[in-house]
Curated annotation (Swiss-Prot):
The lineage of its organism: Eukaryota, Metazoa, Spiralia, Lophotrochozoa, Mollusca. Keywords: Disulfide bond, Secreted, Signal, Toxin. GO terms for molecular function: toxin activity. This is Conotoxin Vc7.1. Residues 23-49 form a propeptide.
Length: 80
């Protein structure tokens, strides 16, 4: 049990050492200097929107395709 306790303390000490070597987190004081590109780049947020198309009077999420009859339908409704 003595060895297990020493091993536990060694692991905790090494964990603290490696944690202190990590990248520091910005404080609220330095929030003005935030350089996170995801928050300021609008193209990141626009890429998550669904694109809708108009297929013969129907709004389709995944685009249109033509059936064998030449009729336009939404792609997810059994187009060939």
């Amino acid at each position: 049990m003595n060895t297990a306790g020493r091993l536990l303390l060694l692991c905790l000490a090494l964990g603290l050492v490696f944690e202190s070597l990590g990248i520091p987190v910005a404080d609220d004081v330095e929030a003005v200097r935030d350089t996170d590109p995801d928050e300021k780049d609008p193209s990141v947020h626009n890429s998550l929107k669904a694109v809708y198309g108009d297929c013969g009077g129907e709004r389709c999420r995944f685009g249109c395709c033509k059936t064998d009859d030449g009729e336009e339908k939404c792609q997810h409704f059994g187009c060939p």
